[in-house]
């Protein structure tokens, strides 16, 4: 079992991060191996946790690969990763 902290906290945060990464619901869904309707469903959760832990980790990793970092504290948000 992984002890990795998951920073995905709300559907709004997911939508903001996806847009910041330049992804559509369709492209994020394809990258995660789910239908775009699943992404749309998760984003509609607004101020609630959008999905379960296994998906949270996959979503967070996918967004990181597209240059976006999620954070949960002090409030849920997303930012562009620094270029190396």
Q: What are these regions, as identified by a protein language model?
A:
Residues 53-71:
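DNA major-groove recognition helix of helix-turn-helix/homeodomain DNA-binding modules
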Residues 2, 68-84:
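Helix-turn-helix/homeodomain-like alpha-helical modules used for DNA recognition
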Residues 14, 28-29, 39-42:
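Conserved hydrophobic/aromatic packing and binding residues within compact polymer-binding modules
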Residues 9, 20, 31, 54, ...:
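Cell-envelope/extracellular anchoring and linker segments
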Residues 1-19:
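A short, Lys/Arg-rich alpha-helix, primarily the initiator
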Residues 33-51:
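Recognition helix of helix-turn-helix/homeodomain-like DNA-binding domains
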Residues 13-27, 83:
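Short basic helix-loop element that most often maps to the first helix and adjoining turn
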């Amino acid at each position: 079992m992984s002890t990795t902290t998951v920073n995905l906290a709300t559907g709004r945060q997911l939508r903001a991060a996806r847009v910041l990464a330049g992804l559509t619901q369709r492209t994020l869904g394809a990258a995660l191996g789910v239908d775009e309707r699943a992404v749309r469903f998760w984003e509609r959760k607004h101020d609630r946790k959008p999905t379960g832990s296994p998906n949270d980790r996959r979503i967070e990793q996918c967004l990181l690969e597209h240059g976006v970092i999620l954070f949960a504290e002090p409030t849920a948000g997303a930012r562009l990763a620094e270029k190396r």
